[in-house]
């Protein structure tokens, strides 16, 4: 049974791609049809790719690896931060600073500075300083926390990156490739799936879609770290407790009919 059902993907709007004039031909293998100028993603392909990504991330974490969740576009920020925290991993949700991976030694000095500022507040140092200086230090800490807070506890290179929209996060993907770090991520119809080790075709502009796919990857981390007494318990909340297969839930004919009858608008930017 798949880690996420096709029905859940449909309900979250994962199947809505970009406008047909904004597409990457390399995504053609993941496209089901076109509807009102919008590409419709083949969710049967999405199911397979998310299963592959889930197993891949789970196995990496089970071997002691760590995941860096990356998503700085508005639609992805909350899901990236929430799900990374839920599974105890690292994240970048505000801004990718050039060199976060390839110049980590320098980035690490800024992280150490952030830790130092927190220590100064906790040990009472702030109480001994003039208010103006404390205000300056607090502003410095807020800026560092915004950009580096999600990787404060990252003491080594991540074993894998999970990205939302590799076109947006091209610098992160490029740095990972330089260092030989595998990348898994959500690719919409305007992206190049060949940039990733495992590409999950899906809507990267709809908050619900991003949340569903990101939470599934977080579940893979949780399974690897904690194990599961009941395999159904750690799947996404939207996963139905059923013994029906995805094909029985939503067949290709059902999907086509859904697309033809759907009046839902795409979350296209």
Swiss-Prot record:
It holds the Pfam family Ribosomal_S2. GO terms for cellular component: cytosolic small ribosomal subunit. Residues 224-269 are annotated as: Disordered. Residues 230-269 have a biased composition (Acidic residues). Keywords: Ribonucleoprotein, Ribosomal protein. GO terms for biological process: translation. InterPro entries: Ribosomal_uS2, Ribosomal_uS2_bac/mit/plastid, Ribosomal_uS2_CS, Ribosomal_uS2_flav_dom_sf. One of its GO terms (molecular function) is structural constituent of ribosome. Belongs to the universal ribosomal protein uS2 family. NCBIfam families: rpsB_bact. HAMAP family: Ribosomal_uS2_B. This is Small ribosomal subunit protein uS2. The gene is rpsB.
């Amino acid at each position: 049974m798949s880690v996420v059902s096709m029905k859940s993907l449909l309900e979250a709007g994962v199947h809505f791609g970009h406008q047909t004039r904004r597409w990457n031909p390399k995504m053609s293998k993941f496209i089901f049809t076109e509807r009102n100028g919008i590409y419709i993603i083949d969710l049967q392909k999405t199911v397979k790719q998310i299963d592959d990504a889930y197993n891949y991330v789970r196995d990496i974490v089970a071997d002691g690896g760590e995941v860096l969740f990356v998503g700085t576009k508005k639609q992805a920020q909350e899901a990236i931060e929430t799900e990374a925290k839920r599974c105890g991993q690292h994240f970048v949700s505000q801004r990718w600073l050039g060199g976060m991976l390839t110049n980590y030694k320098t980035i690490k000095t800024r992280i150490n500075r952030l830790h130092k500022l927190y220590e100064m507040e906790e040990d009472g140092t702030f109480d001994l300083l003039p208010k103006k200086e404390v205000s300056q230090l607090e502003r410095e800490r807020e800026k560092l926390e915004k950009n580096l807070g999600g990787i404060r506890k990252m003491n080594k290179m991540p074993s894998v990156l999970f990205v939302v929209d590799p076109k947006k996060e091209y610098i992160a993907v490029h740095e990972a490739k330089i260092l030989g770090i595998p990348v898994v991520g959500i690719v919409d119809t305007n992206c190049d799936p060949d940039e990733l080790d495992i590409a999950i075709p899906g809507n990267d502009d709809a908050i619900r879609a991003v949340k569903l796919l990101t939470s599934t990857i977080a579940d893979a981390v949780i399974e690897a770290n904690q194990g599961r007494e009941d395999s159904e318990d750690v799947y996404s909340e939207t996963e139905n407790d059923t013994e029906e297969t995805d094909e029985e839930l939503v067949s290709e004919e059902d999907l086509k009919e859904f697309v033809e009858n759907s009046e839902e608008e795409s979350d296209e930017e």
